[in-house]
A protein has these predicted regions:
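Structured-RNA-binding interfaces characteristic of tRNA pseudouridine synthases
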Residues: 1-245
Length: 245
C-alpha cells in the first residue's frame, strides 16, 4: 500500500467542519468521495487535526493509504478537476509507511482575523470577525506574551474537551496589523485544544476592550477554569495556516 500525503486549502463556509458527520457535508467526506472516483477504492483520510464548521485552511495536511498506481501529480491534478472550487489540493507526495498526518505533528500555526471598524464588510464577512468597538492592540499583544511556553490551557479549552491532557507549548503568540482596520492574531504551538484559539481570541478581545486587565489575563491562565475566560470567537476568522512535521 502507498501512503499519500495531501496539502489542502479550503474555505470552510459551506461545510460542517473537517470530520465526517452524519448530518452535514464535511470537507473530509467530499475529498474521500473524489478519491474513490479516481481510484475505485474507499479510503480514510487522516488530517493533522479537525477544523470546526466555518473555519478555513491554507495548509491542512492529510494522508491516506491506497494501492492505486496513479502518480502523485495525477492525484492533485485529478482531484482538483473533481473537487468544488472551495477545496483545493495544493500538492501530493508519497510518504514513508510510518508517516501519520495527525500523530507526526511537531508544530501548527493558526491565524485569526479581526475587522476592527464600525461598518462591516460584504467581501470579508466570511473571513473575519467584525468587531465595531475600539480595541487596544498593544494591551492585547502584552497579554498574549503570557501564553508563551509550556502551560496548562484548561481555561481556553472547549466545554466538552476531546483530550484529557490540557498542556500545550506555545512558541509564538502575536498580534499584527495587516491592512487598514484589519489585524491578525498568529499563534504557533505543538498542538491545540478544541476551540483553544477561538477562546484565546475571545478573551484577548476582552483585554482590548479594557474589560480584563493584563494581570487579570494572567490569572485566567492560572485558574485553569473555562468559566473565567472570555467568549468563544466566531469561527469564520480562523485559518489553519500550516503544519510542521
Amino acid at each position: 500500500m502507498r501512503n499519500i500525503k495531501l496539502l489542502i486549502e479550503y474555505e470552510g463556509t459551506n461545510y460542517h467542519g473537517w470530520q465526517v458527520q452524519p448530518n452535514g457535508l464535511t470537507i473530509q467526506e467530499v475529498i474521500e468521495e473524489k478519491i474513490a472516483v479516481m481510484t475505485g477504492q474507499r479510503v480514510r483520510l487522516t488530517a493533522s487535526g479537525r477544523t470546526d464548521a466555518g473555519v478555513h485552511a491554507l495548509g491542512q495536511v492529510a494522508n491516506f493509504q491506497t494501492s492505486s498506481q496513479i502518480p502523485t501529480e495525477g492525484f492533485w491534478r485529478g482531484l482538483n478537476s473533481l473537487l468544488p472550487p472551495d477545496i483545493i489540493i495544493k500538492s501530493a507526495a508519497e510518504m514513508d509507511p510510518g508517516f501519520h498526518a495527525q500523530f507526526g505533528v511537531k508544530r501548527k500555526t493558526y491565524c485569526y482575523w479581526i475587522l476592527n471598524r464600525e461598518p462591516p464588510s460584504a467581501i470579508y464577512r466570511n473571513y473575519s470577525w467584525h468587531f465595531p468597538l475600539p480595541l487596544n492592540q498593544r494591551a492585547m499583544q502584552d497579554a498574549a506574551g503570557n501564553l508563551l511556553g509550556k502551560k496548562d490551557f484548561s481555561s481556553f479549552r472547549a466545554a466538552h474537551p476531546d483530550t484529557t491532557d490540557p498542556v500545550r507549548e506555545v512558541f509564538k503568540a502575536e498580534w499584527s496589523a495587516k491592512k487598514p482596520s484589519f489585524f491578525c492574531f498568529t499563534v504557533e504551538a505543538d498542538g491545540f485544544l478544541k476551540h483553544m484559539v477561538r477562546n484565546l481570541v475571545g478573551t484577548l478581545v476582552e483585554v482590548g476592550k479594557g474589560k480584563i486587565s493584563g494581570e487579570g489575563f494572567k490569572q485566567i491562565i492560572k485558574a485553569r477554569d473555562r468559566r473565567k475566560a472570555g467568549v468563544t470567537a466566531p469561527p469564520q476568522g480562523l485559518f489553519l495556516v500550516g503544519v510542521e512535521y
